[in-house]
Amino acid sequence: MFLSDFDYELPPELIAQHPASRRDASRLLTLDRLSGAIGEATVASIAAQFLPGDLLVLNDTRVIPARLHGHKESGGAVEIFLVRRVAGEPECWSCLIKASKSPKNGCRVVFPGGVTATVLERDGGDWRVLFEGSDDFMAWLEQTGSMPLPPYIKRAPEGEDLERYQTVFAREKGAVAAPTAGLHFTPAILDEIRGRGVEIVSVTLHVGLGTFMPIRVEDLSEHTMHRELYRIPQETAAAIRRTKERGGRVVALGTTSLRALEHAAASGEVAAGEREADIFILPGYRFRVVDALITNFHLPKSTLFMLVCAFAGKEAMLEAYREAVSRRFRFFSYGDAMFIG
């Protein structure tokens, strides 16, 4: 398969630069995987898409203010962008570093509050960095860092982003990008879904900067997928087993939830625990866990667009995207949503 197979035309004015007036005010495009039928609804009415006995799986990651500004001990300015936490080491991160000169192993960066960062080594295309000097690193980060926004949002972060670029169920700090399908959901919508006889559980996948990185090869067999840290609780794995046994659907809220579940089921059944997902889902992939997907619209030629093409069929998905463009749906992180069932 080739990168050019997953391209589509998108007028730039359809890329949402701000969130909708309310979380549940977005539009919803529906796609039936079996018939290819396309419909339209609203996020406010999304509970109607669920059936009694379904299981909804959320990603409860919380976006952190991942952009930090400090200086070398010699005085030069340094910007560090946290990409992902190193598994098992809460204050060691893979980072992007912007400075006048490329950093060297052992270089120390000083930040407000007495925190220092030591550059340890290269970690693929990133740097592995150890932060020291804070009793509560995440609390310090909340005070010191700035909120990241996706590169296709062509404006500076504003006050509304602190609330709206975060899901209402965000809990586990560690993402540098939001699981955007969840941005539409309100407590009232979740209550309405529960009222239809649907169980709701969570996973944690800390969305990394790699979600925005373009694929740089035409032959997709040559692409190396980025890694993201995730955790499946025991109760979530058990709920999935119960749902499958009774014939219910597992509905993933967002591609991040889907990637965590499918990676955790590599041996057949979803296994609880903490791992790193590097799963690259292309058409032809056999889905083991997820039966329905709620997702936003994804960038052309992106790994996430390839994922939804694998889930619904490439031609059906391309047709759905053409329909979304013709109906002037809003695209990407602050855009509208899809329910693929």
UniProtKB/Swiss-Prot annotation:
Subcellular localization, as worded in the UniProt entry: Cytoplasm
Pfam family, one: Queuosine_synth
Annotated catalysed reactions: 7-aminomethyl-7-carbaguanosine(34) in tRNA + S-adenosyl-L-methionine = epoxyqueuosine(34) in tRNA + adenine + L-methionine + 2 H(+)
SUPFAM superfamilies given in the database record: QueA-like (SSF111337)
Single GO cellular component term: cytoplasm
Subunit structure as annotated in this protein's UniProt entry: Monomer.
Functional description taken from the UniProt entry: Transfers and isomerizes the ribose moiety from AdoMet to the 7-aminomethyl group of 7-deazaguanine (preQ1-tRNA) to give epoxyqueuosine (oQ-tRNA).
Family in the record: Belongs to the QueA family.
Name recorded for this polypeptide: S-adenosylmethionine:tRNA ribosyltransferase-isomerase
Organism from which the protein derives: Citrifermentans bemidjiense (strain ATCC BAA-1014 / DSM 16622 / JCM 12645 / Bem)
